[in-house]
Structure formats: C-alpha cells, structure tokens
Design a protein with these regions (language model features):
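Anionic ligand-binding catalytic core segments
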Residues: 2-111
Length: 111
C-alpha cells in the first residue's frame, strides 16, 4: 500500500491500479513466454490517466514533486525471485529482467 501526502500534510492512498501488465503477467494472450521481453515491454500501455507510464510519472512529479522512491535493489529482487519457487525459471527470469531494467531506468528514484 502506498500513500501520497499533499501540501497540507494530508495523506491519500496512491492511485496504483494494476501492476499485472507492467510485469507482462498475461502470458497466454498479450505477452507470450518465449518472445523477447524488451520488445514486449515496449508494447505495454498504462490504463489510467495516460497510456504512457513515463508521462504519468512526469505529471505526478510536476504536481506533487518527486515523492515516488524505490527502497529495494537488484539484489533484493534476485533474492525474492529465488524464493518464488511456484513459478517457472522463464517467468522468474522475465520478472527479473523487467525489474532490473526499471531499476536502471528510474535510478534517480532510488533511496
């Protein structure tokens, strides 16, 4: 659960709706296993304010400042995925690739 704080110090729940597409979780129809993960990442579209995740982040930062921070590392991702034994190596590898790429892309958000 994430929250946002406004200028008056009041908190509201962060509008995070669906992280499924962000992790290419529909492996049957939209994001089949075996296809290039980076190519598939380019096809993902947000479904809220804008279809572009970066545009949504830019708007949020413009309105509220840079309040989104990551408190995890690639090592944390790797350790968590090592424990996710219920998923195939292919699925875990895909999630690892996606999260590592996003950590690199949004390095300025890391705490």
């Amino acid at each position: 659960i994430a929250v946002l704080m406004n200028g008056a110090g009041m908190f509201k729940y962060c509008p995070i709706f669906d992280n499924g597409d962000g992790l290419l979780s529909d492996t049957i129809l939209d994001y089949p296993l075996g296809e290039d993960t980076f190519d598939l990442m380019e096809t993902v579209r947000a479904k809220t304010v804008s279809t572009d995740f970066d545009e949504q982040l830019d708007v949020s930062e413009h309105l509220y400042g840079c309040n989104l921070k990551f408190f995890f590392t690639k090592r944390d991702v790797d350790q968590l995925l090592e424990q996710a034994k219920g998923y195939s190596d292919e699925v875990r590898g895909r999630v690892q690739t996606i999260l590592h790429r996003q950590i690199d892309k949004y390095a300025y958000l890391k705490m």
